[in-house]
């Protein structure tokens, strides 16, 4: 991905998504990756001032800055602290391209500001919408806005003139990977006004796997054995599953007209997210410059 830097206004997430890959980073604050991650939110109240200082450095060459690559910039705490407007203004004033990925419908508050920022620097917006089943969505993403609220945010952003991408991440094996679910989700996303969809299968790194396994035992014990087969010895679903998923979802994405345009309209170059896919067409996250959490140990876990 053509992204060098990441800015965050807070650490950890009131969204409490069971599958969140950022959970292990809470351990570096001497907090756990489960309940503490969901309830103990660290707010960086001076983030806009600190960012302006960084952007003023002679060494800063206006690389693309991604907001929302680790934890969500528009979770509930943002409604109180209003940190994102200062971040957006700082980036725009310096001519720094920015992108925002969020589950938060609070993004709508800042659409006028983002429209103004786009006059000074490229702005890329994306909503994370992975689950079309409302009951499942509230069970596994209990602190997030509903799927319909996020789709309404897609519509609002599109009406404000943005090309809005949707990240269907993660696709949950045996829960959201059926053709019926995928087709219904893509239909709603298209109707909302999104222009493209990017997807990936569930990734269970150490620290996340334990929490997800606990949820699975409580809510879907019938799937424990099947998850053991997929994730018992590693963090990623086997290549065979990912290839199967690609063969199922890519034709559906194309049928709904949601394939990502290979050229970025802001720069005239290949879109960065188009470069961020593996051989099976899945999105792969690259480590952003400035990430403060070291990579977890690659050790097998047998929790399912």
For each feature predicted by the language model, list its residue ranges:
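Conserved Radical SAM active-site core
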Residues: 1-11, 18-126, 130-138, 147, ...
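Short beta-strand segments at enzyme active-site cores
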Residues: 66, 101, 164-168, 197-201
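A structural motif
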Residues: 95-96, 162, 194
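Active-site glycine- and acidic-residue-rich loops that bind
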Residues: 105-108, 172-183
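Surface-exposed amphipathic alpha-helices with a cationic face
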Residues: 115-118, 154-159, 250, 254
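Conserved strand-turn element in the central/C-terminal portion of the radical SAM core barrel
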Residues: 132-134, 141-143, 156-178, 202-204
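Auxiliary Fe-S-binding modules of radical SAM enzymes
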Residues: 177-304
């Amino acid at each position: 991905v053509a992204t060098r830097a990441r800015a965050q206004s807070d650490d950890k997430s009131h969204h409490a998504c069971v599958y969140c890959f950022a959970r292990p980073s809470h351990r570096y604050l001497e907090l756990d990756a489960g309940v503490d991650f969901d309830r103990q939110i660290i707010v960086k109240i001076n983030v806009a001032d600190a960012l302006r200082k960084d952007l003023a450095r002679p060494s800063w060459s206006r690389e693309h800055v991604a907001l929302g690559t680790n934890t969500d910039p528009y979770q509930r705490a943002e409604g109180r602290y209003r940190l994102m407007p200062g971040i957006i203004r700082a980036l725009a004033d310096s001519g720094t391209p920015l992108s925002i990925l969020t589950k938060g419908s609070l993004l709508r508050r800042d659409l006028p500001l983002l429209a103004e920022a786009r006059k000074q620097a490229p702005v890329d917006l994306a909503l994370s919408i992975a689950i079309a089943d409302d009951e499942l969505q509230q069970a596994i993403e209990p602190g997030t806005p509903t799927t319909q609220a996020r789709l309404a945010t897609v519509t609002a952003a599109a009406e404000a003139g943005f090309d809005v991408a949707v990240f269907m991440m993660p696709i949950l094996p045996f829960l959201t990977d059926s053709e019926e679910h995928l087709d219904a989700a893509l239909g709603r996303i298209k109707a909302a006004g999104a222009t493209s969809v990017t997807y990936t299968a569930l990734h269970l790194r150490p620290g996340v796997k334990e929490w997800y396994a606990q949820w699975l035992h409580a809510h879907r014990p019938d799937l424990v054995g099947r998850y053991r087969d997929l994730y018992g010895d590693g963090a990623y679903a086997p290549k065979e599953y990912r290839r199967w998923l690609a063969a199922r979802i890519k034709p559906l994405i194309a049928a709904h007209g949601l394939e990502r345009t290979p050229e970025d309209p802001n720069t005239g170059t290949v879109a960065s997210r188009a470069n961020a896919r593996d051989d099976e067409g899945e999105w792969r996250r690259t480590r952003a410059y400035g990430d403060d959490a070291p990579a977890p140990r690659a050790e097998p876990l047998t929790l399912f």
